Each structure stands twice: as C-alpha cells, then as structure tokens.
C-alpha cells in the first residue's frame, strides 16, 4: 500500500470531521420532525421581530408576562432573516438555524486548534473529536441553540483571532476580534462571559505584554460599539435592572462535580474522548504545559451552568494530544526492541520538554504508520456509531405530534385570556418541551413555564424553578388534592395533562411513565370536566 503522508491524512480527517459532524448536528431534528427540546420562547421572539418590523421590541409576547426583550437578539434576527428569506415559519427557523451554526462551529474550531497546536495533524484530530463529542453538539442543536450555536461559533472565531493578535500583533486582527466578539455578546449571555474570561486567560498564558494588553482594550471598545444597539435600547426601555437580574441567575456550584468525575462529554457508551483527554492532561502536565488543562477547568468556576460547552473546546485538543503523543507513540515504540525502556525514555522526554511552538518534536516521520491508521479507523467507526446513537436518543426530547395537535385545539377553542396548569411529570424544567412550547403554540398563559422568567425573577429565579417541582410531582399521586395544596384553583382555568412521559432530562425513558391514578381522581372530581382527550393528552376545564 502506498504510504500516506500526515498532511494528506490530516486533510482527510478534517473533511470527515466537517461533513460527518454536520450530519450529526442536523440528524436529531431530522429524526424528530420538530425542534429538539426547547426554543418555544425564541420562536415567539422571532415573530415579535416580524410584528415590530425588525425594531427591537420592548417586551416579548411569550406567556403574557411582559418579559423584557432583554436577551441578546442576534439569534432572533438570524431566525427572522431565515424565515423571511426561505418563506418558513419561526418554528421551522428555530428547528434549522441552530444546526446550521453548530455545523459552522466545526471549521471555526479547526482554526482555533490550528492557532494553538501549530500543527494541522493535531488540529484535524482535535476537530474530529470536537465534531463527534456529544456535549459539543447537544445543547447547540436544540431549539434554544438559536442563540447558543451562533454564540459558540463567534466565540471560537474571536479566540482564534485573539491568539493571532497576541502572537503576531496584526493590527487588522483588532477589528476582526472586536467584530466577532461583539457578535458573540449579541448572541448569548453565557457566550459573552466565556469569551471574555477565555480572552483574559489566553492573554495571560500567551503574551502578558503591554502591547497585547492595549490591543485587547481596543478590541473591547469595538465589542462595546458592535453590541451597543442592543444594550443601549434595553437600558432605554428598562434601565439596567434586566441585566442585573439576568446576571443573578447564572452559576451552578454542583457543576464542578461534572469536572471531578469527568462525565461532561456525555458519551453514551465508552467515554473514549474523555479518557484520551485525561491522558492528554497528564501528558501536558508532565511537559509543564498548563494552558489547555487550566483552560478546561476555568469554565466550571466561572459559569458552572454552561461550563461543559466551553470546556469541550480544550478537551478535544487534549484528547488529540493524548492519542498522538501518548497512545500512538507508545504503540509505535512497543513495535521495536526494548519497548518498555523506550516508553520510559519517551515519558522522561515528555516531562522535560518545554517547547510550545509546535508539536513536531514528537513526530518521528512524515509518513503515517499502519498502527496509527488502523487504530484511527476503529476510533472513527466507534465515534460515528456512538454519536449517532446519542443523536437518536436526543431526537426523543421533542414535542410529539399529539401534543402539537392538542395545543392547536387550545388555540382555536379556548379564550385568549385563559390560564393553564400544564402537567407533564418531568423533573427538569430545562428539558420539558411541552411546558416551553405550550405558550408559543397556543398563545395562552402557562403558570409554571419558567423560560424567560430569569429576566423578571433575578436572584429568586432558582427558588421559582424549585417551586414548580411539587406541582409536577402531583402526577404521581392518586389524589388530586395534592394539586390543590400545590396551587390554588383560582390561579388557572384549565389543566393540561400529558398522559405519557416519553423522556426525562432530555433522554428517552426505557419504560415510559403513565399516570392512571391521577387521571382517575381528576375524572372523579366534580370540579373538573374533560373538554379534550386523545390517547396522549387530556385537558380538563374547571366547572
């Protein structure tokens, strides 16, 4: 067989990463036939822009709560443009735009990896791990990815440009980093936080020069200028209060345990990428190369709720280093004589090495070895299967057709001012498609839908979320008096019940849950009357 050069292999890997990764990002919504999980509020906000002729509205119509339209609006404008350009509904825009920008993030990641690792072979393998790491795609391809995926895309471009600015001092990069950074800020609040913190960290690790610091200040001024139309309008309408309340809802202290147990890759079977990442961490620490390990840890202490997404970026690079510099190098060494001694020498060489300008020091040949080729082919096939299976499971976290039909009935047959108590039995408000999509598809108010309330509740947001759990737990009760203890009947006009719980925490249940005893008690209650019923949904109206 003709020898394969590493450059040719790297080009092939990159091409596979981009195309297979894009397929994996579009596949869940293709399988579901609807947006994955969330995005109901965002669909309404896309329609709000249509009603306001693209001017930033003061409030969103979602759930009739006068929620300030304070969310970074770039994703909504992208959704509105896609809807108008292709003649699709806001719901369809929320379905497709996230997967599109999540796919664009793959080549953007390659650019960042190439700037950091200084070698296209390592960068290409890193990109493949990023493309096929479940956590690098899951929350970005959901309906809520309308803002998350552009935020991820522009964050990657910002950091890649900043690295070149710090290392090469190109003046044009000040403009481009400011532009991309401004678009990241305009996309998602957590993307703004992680971009800002990562930029400071990279400056500290790569430069620490006065010139780079001044350039960073110039980038920051451009970011403020680019994002000014949004935050100036919000301050004009509402003052700074929505921003203060939004900032008070972040954090998740327990997220650090995801780092401790190294489970945040969300791989459904063998955690291959996580294990290779751990090997890469050990190797980098032995070389006293702390940039990637520290960068992976920082998000969990800055913004724990969303830490896994940005942590996946350095982890993918660490996994590539672990695979090439440790696994491949050890296997190649074992083929020769005195394998154990050579491995020991290799480890010692790694420990004392301090060269950071590139990774060519550990490559013995420009030719790809048969071991590398065979192991890589196996890893590729396994990761494709694993990621496809994850996407298949993720496709179950969607709004099922019976719920869509029931919500259409609600829109057409109930008063516009009607208030609904929506019961699904889920234990995660962030993975409850019915609760979030109900106000969007019906135009009616849902009492315990939490989306958007972070801009109203502020520091009380987490307490408000916890207050929704007792209501959902009533579905497991055989006595509907549980409901009366959780919420007064005067607060709602109808009770919407999903009879079957298909998935929980965004993953399908092995055994679907039903709630026959609760439904029987509701039917027996003279205060309620079933006004709509199908095999999957029942709606009770108060007598």
Label each residue range with its predicted role:
Residues 99, 303-335, 339-346:
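Hydrophobic/aromatic-rich transmembrane helices and adjacent perimembrane loops
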Residues 4-8, 206-217, 265-297, 336-353, ...:
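Membrane-interface helix-loop-helix junctions at transmembrane boundaries of multi-pass membrane enzymes
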Residues 15-18, 216, 220, 224, ...:
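Transmembrane alpha-helix segments characteristic
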Residues 155-176, 280-286:
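Membrane-interface transmembrane helices that cradle and orient dolichyl/undecaprenyl
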Residues 1-27, 365-378:
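Start-transfer (signal-anchor) and selected internal transmembrane alpha helices
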Residues 38, 175, 184-282, 312, ...:
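Transmembrane catalytic cores of multi-pass membrane glycosyltransferases
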Residues 18, 102, 107, 111, ...:
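Extracytoplasmic
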Residues 11-156, 189-193, 396-399, 420-426, ...:
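Active-site lumenal/periplasmic loops and adjacent helix-entry segments of GT-C-fold
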């Amino acid at each position: 067989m003709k020898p394969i050069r590493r450059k040719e292999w790297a080009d092939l890997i990159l091409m596979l990463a981009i195309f297979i990764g894009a397929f994996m990002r579009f596949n869940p919504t293709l399988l579901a036939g609807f947006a994955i999980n969330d995005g109901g509020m965002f669909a309404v906000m896309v329609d709000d822009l249509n009603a306001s002729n693209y001017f930033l509205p003061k409030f969103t119509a979602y759930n009739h709560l006068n929620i300030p339209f304070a969310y970074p609006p770039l994703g909504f404008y992208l959704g509105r443009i896609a809807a108008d350009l292709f003649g699709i509904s806001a719901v369809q825009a929320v379905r497709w735009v996230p997967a599109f920008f999540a796919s664009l993030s793959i080549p953007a990641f390659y650019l960042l990896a190439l700037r950091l690792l200084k070698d296209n072979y390592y960068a290409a393998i890193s990109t493949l791990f990023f493309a096929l790491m479940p956590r690098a795609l899951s929350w970005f391809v959901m309906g809520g990815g309308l803002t998350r995926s552009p935020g991820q895309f522009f964050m990657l471009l910002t950091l890649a440009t900043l690295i070149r600015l710090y290392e090469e001092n190109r003046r044009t990069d000040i403009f481009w980093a400011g532009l991309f950074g401004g678009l990241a800020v305009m996309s998602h609040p957590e993307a703004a936080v992680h971009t800002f913190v990562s930029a400071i960290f990279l400056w500290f690790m790569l430069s620490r020069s006065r010139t780079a610091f001044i350039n960073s200040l110039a980038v920051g001024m451009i970011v403020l200028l680019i994002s000014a139309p949004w935050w100036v309008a919000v301050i004009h309408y509402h003052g700074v209060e929505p921003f203060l309340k939004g900032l008070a809802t972040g954090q998740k202290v327990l997220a650090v345990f995801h780092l401790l147990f190294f489970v945040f890759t969300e791989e459904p079977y063998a955690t291959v990428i996580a294990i290779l990442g751990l090997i890469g961490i050990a190797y980098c620490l032995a070389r006293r190369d702390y940039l990637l390990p520290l960068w992976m840890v920082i998000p969990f202490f800055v913004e724990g709720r969303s830490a896994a997404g940005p942590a996946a970026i350095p982890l993918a690079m660490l996994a590539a280093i672990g695979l090439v510099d440790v696994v491949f190098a050890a296997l190649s060494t074992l083929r020769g004589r005195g394998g154990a001694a050579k491995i020991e020498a290799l480890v010692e060489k790694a420990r004392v090495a301090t060269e950071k300008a590139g990774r060519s020091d550990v490559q013995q040949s420009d030719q790809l070895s048969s071991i590398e080729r065979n192991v890589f082919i196996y890893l590729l096939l396994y990761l494709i299967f694993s990621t496809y299976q994850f996407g298949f499971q993720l496709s179950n976290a969607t709004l099922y057709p019976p719920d869509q039909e029931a919500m259409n009935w609600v829109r057409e047959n109930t008063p516009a001012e009607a208030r609904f108590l929506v019961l699904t039995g889920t234990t995660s408000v962030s993975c409850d498609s019915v609760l979030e999509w109900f106000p969007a598809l019906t135009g009616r108010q849902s009492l315990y839908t939490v989306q958007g309330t972070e801009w109203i509740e502020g520091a009380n947001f987490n307490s408000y979320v916890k207050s929704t759990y007792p209501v959902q737990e009533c579905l497991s009760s055989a006595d509907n008096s549980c409901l009366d203890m959780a919420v007064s009947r005067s607060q709602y006009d109808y009770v919407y019940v999903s009879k079957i719980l298909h998935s929980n925490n965004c993953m399908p249940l092995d055994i679907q849950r039903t709630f026959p005893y609760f439904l029987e008690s509701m039917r027996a209650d003279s205060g309620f009357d079933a006004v709509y019923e199908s095999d999957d949904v029942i709606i009770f109206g108060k007598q």
